[in-house]
From Swiss-Prot:
<feature type="modified residue" description="Phosphoserine">
    <location>
        <position position="122"/>
    </location>
</feature>
<dbReference type="GO" id="GO:0006228">
    <property type="term" value="P:UTP biosynthetic process"/>
</dbReference>
<dbReference type="GO" id="GO:0006183">
    <property type="term" value="P:GTP biosynthetic process"/>
</dbReference>
<dbReference type="InterPro" id="IPR001564">
    <property type="entry name" value="Nucleoside_diP_kinase"/>
</dbReference>
<protein>
    <recommendedName>
        <fullName>Nucleoside diphosphate kinase</fullName>
        <ecNumber>2.7.4.6</ecNumber>
    </recommendedName>
</protein>
<keyword id="KW-0963">Cytoplasm</keyword>
<keyword id="KW-0547">Nucleotide-binding</keyword>
<feature type="binding site">
    <location>
        <position position="85"/>
    </location>
    <ligand>
        <name>ATP</name>
    </ligand>
</feature>
<dbReference type="InterPro" id="IPR034907">
    <property type="entry name" value="NDK-like_dom"/>
</dbReference>
<feature type="binding site">
    <location>
        <position position="102"/>
    </location>
    <ligand>
        <name>ATP</name>
    </ligand>
</feature>
<dbReference type="GO" id="GO:0005524">
    <property type="term" value="F:ATP binding"/>
</dbReference>
<keyword id="KW-0479">Metal-binding</keyword>
<keyword id="KW-0067">ATP-binding</keyword>
<feature type="binding site">
    <location>
        <position position="57"/>
    </location>
    <ligand>
        <name>ATP</name>
    </ligand>
</feature>
<dbReference type="InterPro" id="IPR023005">
    <property type="entry name" value="Nucleoside_diP_kinase_AS"/>
</dbReference>
<dbReference type="GO" id="GO:0046872">
    <property type="term" value="F:metal ion binding"/>
</dbReference>
<feature type="binding site">
    <location>
        <position position="9"/>
    </location>
    <ligand>
        <name>ATP</name>
    </ligand>
</feature>
Length: 147
């Protein structure tokens, strides 16, 4: 079963959006197998955003993601990566469709509420940055027969 890493960023946590966002993924039929409220360390942030290291906004990304708690999650389900990307909406909330998380709640590119893995490789890498394997729970849900 495919897994993805999703993170509600500090702006989403501060705006009390955790429940709303988790509910959307649960209603879609995905299974939450790991979750925690945490403060991202500078080392984790730099590893997570390593692909942007040479970009002028790298420091701002690291500062923002370490500025307050995030809600880190691992979700499992059929096509969860692509579906989560659609549910999140465009990176720039101004371009995100209404009904998507960023379209409904995003304020600006820097504060766009949520991060989600963009590929199976990214998902594995990001899950390994933020979770120990002992923090992930595999279980069967009766509802899985219906979704």
């Amino acid at each position: 079963m495919e897994r993805t890493y999703l993170m509600i960023k500090p702006d989403g946590v501060q705006r009390n959006l955790i429940g709303e966002i988790v509910s959307r993924f649960e209603k879609k039929g995905f299974t939450l197998i790991g979750a925690k409220l945490m403060t991202v360390t500078k080392e984790q942030a730099e590893t997570h955003y390593a692909e942007h290291k040479e970009r002028p906004f790298f420091g701002e990304l690291v500062d923002f993601i370490t500025s307050g708690p995030v809600f880190a999650m691992v979700w499992e389900g059929e096509n969860v990566i692509a579906t989560a990307r659609k549910m999140m909406g465009a990176t720039n909330p101004a371009d995100a469709e209404p009904g998507t998380i960023r379209g409904d709640f995003g304020v600006q590119v820097a504060m766009n509420v949520i991060h989600g893995s963009d590929s199976p490789e990214s998902a594995k890498r990001e899950i390994d940055i933020f979770f120990d394997s002992s923090e992930l729970n595999e279980y069967d849900k009766v509802v899985n027969r219906w979704v």
